[in-house]
Amino acid sequence: MPELALLVPGGHGQLGRDLARLAPAHLGDAGFAHAPGSAELDITDADTVRDAVGALAEAARNSGVVPVVVNAAAYTAVDAAEEDEARAHEINAAGAAALAAACAAEAVPLVHVSTDYVFAGDGDRPYEPSDPPAPRSAYGRTKLAGERAVLGGTDRSWVVRTAWVYGAGGGNFVRTMARLERQRDTLSVVSDQVGSPTWSADLAAGL
């Protein structure tokens, strides 16, 4: 398998941190960009995105490795998106479109991380990739728009839908429940949701 030079928007999150651990250390800056501790890439700024992808492509050529962009950046506040869908769209859809355009211009492959929220959520079996999307939330609508922008914007693109991601770093449901358990005598959580908890390190390795 060829060595990769990664650009990971959203590199400060759970998935980004695990991707950073998988990057070849000896490649230095060409091995991983926008890792924890570095400045985050603003995917809503098309010029900045174009410059970042161009720099990745050049560094990869100089190092003899394969450049790949993994988009882990997202507006993930599901409830808040209902009040500010425009902001969610700016990141989840327009930002994804900017990445797709930049990757197409440089012939850099793009892996876009999406969500099960693109489906209606009322099925009685696990969803298949071929099932028709039918988002019922602002978050889901903006993520579906991002998927379509990526797949329509560059031929060398893949969409990976995941759900209930948790990991060693960052905020997630598991950490929230552990914190609340220490603060409260009793906890109330929904009991009518079924999903696929996804360990972020496993997801990173799969990508």
Language model segments and positions:
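SDR active-site strand-loop-helix element
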Residues: 9, 69-73, 110-116, 120, ...
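Catalytic helix-loop patch of NAD(P)-dependent Rossmann-fold dehydrogenases
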Residues: 83, 90-98, 118-160, 164-165
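NAD(P)-dependent short-chain dehydrogenase/reductase
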Residues: 151-197, 201-202
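N-terminal Rossmann NAD(P)H-binding glycine-rich loop of SDR-like oxidoreductase domains
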Residues: 4-24
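Conserved mid-core alpha-helix of short-chain dehydrogenase/reductase
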Residues: 48, 98-101, 149, 202
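NAD(P)H-binding glycine-rich loop region in Rossmannoid oxidoreductase-like domains
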Residues: 43-93, 102
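Adenosine-cofactor binding site in Rossmann-like domains, unifying the SAM/SAH pocket
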Residues: 27, 31-52
